């Protein structure tokens, strides 16, 4: 089970775009 917060999801999205 992963409890990712909305803010954490957005942060990962930005890192993915940078990569």
Swiss-Prot record:
Its main location: nucleus. One of its GO terms (cellular component) is nucleus. Keywords: DNA-binding, Nucleus, Transcription, Transcription regulation. GO terms for molecular function: DNA binding; DNA-binding transcription factor activity. Belongs to the bZIP family. It is found in: Nucleus. This is Probable bZIP transcription factor. It comes from the Eukaryota. Residues 1-19 are annotated as: Basic motif. Residues 1-19 form the bZIP domain. The keyword Transcription regulation applies.
């Amino acid at each position: 089970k992963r409890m990712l917060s909305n803010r954490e999801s957005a942060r990962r999205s930005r890192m993915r775009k940078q990569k």
